[in-house]
Each structure stands twice: as structure tokens, then as C-alpha cells.
Curated annotation (Swiss-Prot):
Alphabetized InterPro entries for the sequence: Bocavirus_NP1
Source species taxonomy: Viruses, Monodnaviria, Shotokuvirae, Cossaviricota, Quintoviricetes
Keywords for this protein: Activator, Host nucleus, Transcription, Transcription regulation
Comp. bias regions, Basic and acidic residues: 15-33, 43-58
GO cellular component terms, A-Z: host cell nucleus
Organism whose genome encodes this protein: Bovine parvovirus 1 (BPV-1)
Main location: host cell
Protein name: Non-structural protein NP-1
Amino acid sequence: MERSRSPRETGSTSSRDKSDADWSERRREERTRTWKSRSPIRAHGERSWGSWRSREKNQSSSTASRPYQKATRKETATKKTKHTPFNVFSAHRALSKTDLQFCGFYWHSTRLASKGTNEIFNGLKQSFQSKAIDGKLDWEGVGELLFEQKKCLDTWYRNMMYHFALGGDCEKCNYWDDVYKKHLANVDTYSVAEEITDSEMLEAAEAVDAANQ
């Protein structure tokens, strides 16, 4: 049989319960104050994460609008200046009057890219038109086009690798690679990377072919 508690015991228990409740309430208030001081939401007086994000987005948009416009103008100005090896080497040759033919890693990598673009616009396009029926081509025909492209790429890369690996020390490679490395060292590191369109690449390919004739 459970013993009934005396008034003293009952009062003592109530005091402890009240003390524990007060302590818990103080801890809760302390944590709330700490959270408010650290929370970016409460620090701005916002009620929700969404409203705070909206505030931050508006501030970012307003503060970044003018710098972004300047960057856009700078980007436009940068794109007007071409920095392909062909342009850089042509300008250097005009100033230095050197009679060395274009060569080197940067030159040949540009030639390969130009040749690939030229092959798509000319060689493969003509092959497709000759094989297509009602403007369509089955998988066998597509495979023939792909192998045609592969044959060209294999030949180009094989010749370039032979030149660099087994062709011996090339004075032209050393000279023109050094020219382009010096050019890259002087280019603004914060400028926007130049984007070359397919038509511009085709023009570069034609210019490269004309320079080699």
C-alpha cells in the first residue's frame, strides 16, 4: 500500500518541480537569444527564410547591376580582338619581319581544329548530300561518313605526333611557341574567354590554307 506524502514532502516536491521548470525556461530563453543573435533571418527582423532570401537577392541585384554592365561592355570589347595563334602570329610577323613558317603546338592544334570544322562544312556535307535519299541517311550511310571523318583525323594527328615526337628539334616550333606563350602572359587574366563561331573557324581554316600555299 502506497504511503501518503506529508505536507512537507509535498511542498518540497512542488518546490523542486518549480525550480526545474524555471531552470528549463531560462535555458530555453538563453538558447533563443543565442539563436536570434546568430541567425541572419532574425538579425534582419525577417519572419521566414524565404523573405530573407528575397531581401538578399534584391540587394545583390541592386549592388551588382552597374559592375555587371561594365563587365558586359568589357566582354564586348574583348570579343572584338581575336587572339587565335593565326592572328597573333600574323601580327608578330608583320612587326618582326621574320621569314620562319608558322609551326609549333599552338599552331598545329589550331590547324587541326580548323580542318575539322572545314571537313564538316565541306567534305562531310557533300558526302551526305550524295548519299542521302529524301534528305535522310540510314545507319550504314552514317557509319561511312563517320569512318571518312575518322580517316582524316587519324592522318592529321599521326602526322602531328610524328613531327613532335620523332621530327627532332624544330627551330620553328620553339620560336612560335615562345611567341604565343609571351602573348598569353600579357593577356588580361580577367578577360572573358573568346568564343569562336563555326563560321569564324571556317574563315580561319581558309586563312591557314592560304598561308601554307
